[in-house]
Amino acid sequence: MRTNPLVLGVSALVEKNVGRIAQIIGPVLDVSFPPGNMPNIYNSLIVKGQGTAGQEIQVTCEVQQLLGNHKVRAVAMSATDGLTRGMRVIDTGAPLSVPVGGATLGRIFNVLGEPVDNLGPVDARITSPIHRSAPAFTELDTKLSIFETGIKVVDLLAPYRRGGKIGLFGGAGVGKTVLIMELINNIAKAHGGVSVFGGVGERTREGNDLYMEMKESGVIDEQNISESKVALVYGQMNEPPGARMRVGLTALTMAEYFRDVNEQDVLSFIDNIFRFVQAGSEVSALLGRMPSAVGYQPTLATEMGSLQERITSTKRGSITSIQAVYVPADDLTDPAPATTFAHLDATTVPSRGLAAKGIYPAVDPLDSTSTMLQPWIVGEEHYETAQGVKQTLQRYKELQDIIAIPGLDELSEEDRLIVARARKIERFLSQPFFVAEVFTGFPGKYVGLMETIRGFQMILSGELEQSFYLVGNIDEATAKAMNSKTES
């Protein structure tokens, strides 16, 4: 950790090593330095000067290649408009560093760690470089443990691993944002943890909408900003590829501080991991590298691995990462999603069909998967209950065509029983969220894992349809059923 001249301002830099711009090709700069004073790979360079219209220019770049003849090739982290050949370039002598710690909570940052929310400067006394090695094997926590979210459908059928990576698939309008906000809320309340959201190459409008919804739901506390539960880092799709390629590392660096120094459980969101790969592909082409399969960068697996391997549990704390995964043209064999899948421990798949029925969270119980759902990890009771729920829902899915045309009367007695239980399960998988109280009118519920297992065991064994809709644990469903009987 050290003082960060990029955040304090260029005036704080000691101009030990100064070069000049030799060539500009879009967001790529070639810079000449004096012999014997070449900057290292990943060093941060700052271009200062005046543009053609007399405006002050300050562009931060990152060294990517040493070309020979005392030249380096760097990629800009912001627009290169107004830069000219011959401009002075200062070598900071270190990689890009960003603010970390409690001061980042409730704030929005860009890739450089600069606040962009108009709420004033951030306490930048503690900073950390964005390029770091993954934790050593001896530091890792090798124990397999479930990361309890308090969301029934997730904890029972596709449990998250503490320090694992989860892929979040799905289109617009199925409740991904609300699910993300509920996870942020629950980790703060149940685990005393914090969250870091990395907006990588997505729409600016989506970033703004998320910020507004977080303020409305209390995840970000405007009145007492230090009580907020999340830090936001945005590198949106209108920014140069260098910024989109590095913004994920900026967010991860902030998360690592909470894990390693504050010894907390951290939830890290990356939306969207495909845009990280896409930005790397653009930078690779700009640097003149030979493309690999489908035009992707030859270093795709290396870049993905260097990001993903930093997301893990250590003996101090954990980073559990939820990554939105865009699948281009729905082709799962595309190198970008295929490389991502190799790192995932679980997948959460929102369902448009469930959302249309008004069942929220609209997580598909059959398509969502987890490597943690093994009897030797979660225990026999949890495993058997989850398998029973899946078998019932799968049989119900197979019977849908018969129900739609001839009707329920054509089913056998056993199948009718399965349909009745599956409908109860489907309703019981719904749950009121704390962050959605404002628009559902139902108080939010956090349901512990043991309560979840007990509830589904009771349904599978043939006990208590409407009683299961938007309730927390099984006792509430029982009370609701008793009230209905009394009223009738």
Curated annotation (Swiss-Prot):
Keywords: ATP synthesis, ATP-binding, CF(1), Chloroplast, Hydrogen ion transport, Ion transport, Membrane, Nucleotide-binding, Plastid, Thylakoid, Translocase, Transport. Its EC number is 7.1.2.2. The keyword ATP-binding applies. Gene3D superfamilies: 2.40.10.170, Bovine Mitochondrial F1-atpase, Atp Synthase Beta Chain, Chain D, domain 3 (1.10.1140.10), P-loop containing nucleotide triphosphate hydrolases (3.40.50.300). InterPro entries: AAA+_ATPase (IPR003593), ATP-synt_VA_C (IPR055190), ATP_synth_F1_bsu (IPR005722), ATPase_a/bsu_AS (IPR020003), ATPase_alpha/beta_chains (IPR050053), ATPase_F1/V1/A1_a/bsu_N (IPR004100), ATPase_F1/V1/A1_a/bsu_N_sf (IPR036121), ATPase_F1/V1/A1_a/bsu_nucl-bd (IPR000194). GO terms for biological process: proton motive force-driven mitochondrial ATP synthesis. ATP binds at residues 170-177. It is a peripheral membrane protein. SMART domains: AAA. GO terms for cellular component: chloroplast thylakoid membrane; mitochondrion; proton-transporting ATP synthase complex. Its main location: plastid. It is found in: Plastid, Chloroplast thylakoid membrane. PANTHER family: ATP SYNTHASE, ATP SYNTHASE SUBUNIT BETA, MITOCHONDRIAL. Belongs to the ATPase alpha/beta chains family. F-type ATPases have 2 components, CF(1) - the catalytic core - and CF(0) - the membrane proton channel. CF(1) has five subunits: alpha(3), beta(3), gamma(1), delta(1), epsilon(1). CF(0) has four main subunits: a(1), b(1), b'(1) and c(9-12). Produces ATP from ADP in the presence of a proton gradient across the membrane. The catalytic sites are hosted primarily by the beta subunits. HAMAP family: ATP_synth_beta_bact. This is ATP synthase subunit beta, chloroplastic. It comes from Picea abies (Norway spruce).
